[in-house]
Structures are given as structure tokens and as C-alpha cells.
Amino acid sequence: MSEEMNDQMQVRRQKLQELIDLGIDPFGHRFNRSSTSSELKEQWDQFSKEELHEKEDESHVSIAGRLMTKRGKGKAGFAHIQDLKGQIQIYVRKDQVGDDQFNIWKMADLGDIIGVEGVMFKTNTGEISVKAKSFTLLSKSLRPLPDKFHGLQDIEQRYRQRYLDLITNEDSTQTFINRSKIIQEMRNYLNKQGFLEVETPMMHQIAGGAAARPFVTHHNALDATLYMRIAIELHLKRLIVGGLEKVYEIGRVFRNEGVSTRHNPEFTMIELYEAYADYHDIMDLTENMVRHIAQEVFGSAKVQYNDEEIDLESSWKRLHIVDAVKEVTGVDFYNVNSDEEAIRLAKEHDIEITENMKYGHILNEFFEQKVEETLIQPTFIYGHPIEISPLAKKNPNDERFTDRFELFIVGREHANAFTELNDPIDQRQRFEAQLVEKEQGNDEAHDMDEDYIEALEYGMPPTGGLGIGIDRLVMLLTDSPSIRDVLLFPYMRQK
């Protein structure tokens, strides 16, 4: 802590004690406010200075917020207070509020939470303001706010002390308001489509539903190892078996992996499943839902991201993964007939691969290393190889591939979906193949889930499923470069 900061805090604590000595509670209780700052402006800014003077008797208001500016000496002063909706100016005069309250006003510091009752007026410059009739200290701020002209310059401090970021950065506050609206519109859209929102466990006995490393925990009373969920998928598909034909869940998912501008150890996903649908139906649903959200929240289906206009309004491109790789690299994996040939092609095109990778893994590496970052406008990539899609249904025309798609926008994956595998015999074989991969060192391979296979053995209808990372979608729609910009409290390394 700097010496200047320490001095300011000492002065504030001295003021705190002075208030207590005067019998004033520096940390107040309830305050009855009539309006927010934006409501006052909307209601009263339409009137002229003279009209407001005539309406003074009917313009009595009460407002509360954080003291952001303060100026004036002697027997009067101006200030701006800030609430969630913005800022409004207040005017405090000694002959209006009385000696005792004006003394409290003089001791007020930037950052204090205050309540004001008064009437509306306009200054000579035309600024709508509240003329205080009474002034109440609601919470004494013992630490000074960041400098009003420079704010929080340290990006890491913004993430670690999000409350300061929200106080001083209007854009940051708006991002999180928009995040809430995005999720709300997602719910509205799905509910109108007849989907049922459900809740499923976050602690699993088996980590499944995605290729990811789980967080491991322990249940003391049961002496059992549990895994924080890496996906919502398998429980929702059990509900499809049970006859809940259209279900979704929005919730936290946990993956024990690296931290980056796109990854946080815990993040928010939506997964949904629709009986009697396939991945083509889910493509349509995804496109229509994202377009609807953008239109409802932002008023346009065309959004800006990193100086690029992203067109969510026009029909989205749909491209088989093999064709996407061929367009960029010239390699046609339809004509690759062995793992050995795929390995040779990887070496020729400088594709990094690891031991034990097969045809499908190598095709996926071609895509991720050469193609993915080129997909700026919304593009559905479909037909992923079976080796990397253990829960997706085989394509009936070419069993090397599955009826699966991923959505890419601005070079990033935003959704993953497929026609769900509902054959319990095939599913068991896929899990067994995953166990072999795990023995060979792939710690993201699936475990065997006997309970899930048993559920499939009772019969699951043809089903389309979808997963969307909500954080990445919010990044896209709010033009935020890092996932930390859209998480109120992102994971940060300990100091």
C-alpha cells in the first residue's frame, strides 16, 4: 500500500470516528428511494428551468447512490451520485438541509454511499439536478476510489477487484447487464419452443460427456471419489430416455485445464436435447436462436467483433470437415485410406501429432491447426470423425464420420452438437475404444459408464443435442477480447 493511500485511509477513519462521536451511524439501514438517476432524467429533463421552478412542489424525489464527484466550498456544493442506471447531479445548501446535515456533507468523501431527498431543478448550464432538502450518509467508504481520470489501468486489478471495475467502468457494467439479458433471451426462446428447463447433478461418480480432464473431490461421509461435471450431457439424455422430450440446462461446468483468453476452469454452458430431431434440426435451432438473441438484446443481427462485422442475419455456411480441410490445405481426406497415409500427410504439412493418433485424430488436427482460425463468419463444420466423437451417431453413408457439427465464428468454436448415439451396443464399443486410448495416455478419454449404457438399453428415441459455451457467446456479442471480461469473478492465480 502506498504512503498516499495509507494517509487517505487514516483521514477517512478519523472522519468515521467523528461521525460516531456525533451519534451518527456511518453504516446506515434502509433508505426509501423513489427513483433511479435515469428515471429522474427521463421524467424531468423535458422541462425547462422555469417550468421546473413552477413544478417544484410536485417534484419531490428521493435518490441514493455512490458519491463520485464533489465540489464547492462555503455554504453550498455540487456533487454527482452514481447508481446502476447512471449518474445525476445533486446540489446541497446549508440553509436547505440544516447545520447538522451540512456538517455531514462536508465530511463526505468520494466513494461514500449517500441518500438525498429534494426537488428537481436545472442549473444555468441546463443540467438536470436534485436540490437537496435532506442528506443522509448510508455507508462510509474507508478506502479511496481509483483516480477518476485514469480508473483501473491494471487489467489484472480489474479482474481481481471486479467491484472497483464496476464502480469506475460503465462499459464493464453494461457487459454484465447484457450477459444477463443474453441468457434471459436464450431461456425465452427455448421455453417458447416447448423446452423444459431442468437441473442435474454437478458432482458425478464418473467423469463423462466431454473430452476433458476433471476436477476430483471426495465425499467424506460416503468415502467416495466424485468428479465435478465436465459436461451436462449424460444426465440430460437419461431424461430423454425417461420421456422428457425437449430439455435444457444452463449451468456451471468444470474442466481441470489451462487458463487463457478463451478458457476458465469453471464456465457456463447450455446443453439441450430434443427427441425425434437430428443434427440438421439442431443446426436450424442454433442459427435461429443466436440470431434471435442478438436481435432482441442488441437490436441487430449484425454485430461488431474486433473491428470485424459478423453477419448473423444471412444464412450460415455449412461445410463438411473434409471439404473445409481440402479448401485450405488441398488434402482430400475422403481419399486417405489408412492411418499410415494420414501420418505421412501430417508430416508433409507440418501438422503436429502425437503417438497413437489415427485417421480421425489427424484429420481433426489438420482442421484445428490450419482451418479453424480462418472461419470468421458463422460456419457450421459437420461430419467429425468417429474417433473424436464417442457419443455421436455414425453417418449412415460413411461410417468414418459422425452426424455431428461444431459452430465456428471469429475463428473460435461456439457450439458442439450431434445426432445422439442411441445404440447401446455401439455405445459400449465406443466407450471400450476410449478406455484403450486412456491406457495409451489420453487422459481426456471417456471412462466406461455402465449406468448410462443401461439407460440406453431401455430405448432412447432418435435425438439431437447441442452444447453452447455461454461465455464465448457473450464475448462475441459484446465484443469482449477475453473470457475474463465476461466473467464477474474469473479464476486468477494466487498472488
From Swiss-Prot:
Subcellular location as annotated: Cytoplasm
Keywords, alphabetical: Aminoacyl-tRNA synthetase, ATP-binding, Cytoplasm, Ligase, Magnesium, Metal-binding, Nucleotide-binding, Protein biosynthesis
One BP term from GO: lysyl-tRNA aminoacylation
GO molecular function terms attached to this record: ATP binding; catalytic activity, acting on a protein; lysine-tRNA ligase activity; magnesium ion binding; transferase activity; tRNA binding
Catalysed reaction equations from the record: tRNA(Lys) + L-lysine + ATP = L-lysyl-tRNA(Lys) + AMP + diphosphate
Enzyme Commission number(s): 6.1.1.6
Xref: CDD domains: LysRS_core, LysRS_N
Cofactor entry: Mg(2+)
SUPFAM superfamilies named in the record: Class II aaRS and biotin synthetases (SSF55681), Nucleic acid-binding proteins (SSF50249)
Residues binding Mg(2+) 2, per UniProt: 413
Keyword Metal-binding: yes
Sequence positions that bind Mg(2+) 1: 406, 413
The record's free-text note on cofactor binding: Binds 3 Mg(2+) ions per subunit.
Gene Ontology cellular component terms for the protein in this record: cytosol
PANTHER family: LYSINE--TRNA LIGASE, CHLOROPLASTIC_MITOCHONDRIAL, LYSYL-TRNA SYNTHETASE
Similarity comment: Belongs to the class-II aminoacyl-tRNA synthetase family.
NCBIfam families associated with the record: lysS_bact, PRK00484.1
Record protein name field: Lysine--tRNA ligase
Organism whose genome encodes this protein: Staphylococcus epidermidis (strain ATCC 35984 / DSM 28319 / BCRC 17069 / CCUG 31568 / BM 3577 / RP62A)
Taxonomic lineage from the root: Bacteria, Bacillati, Bacillota, Bacilli, Bacillales
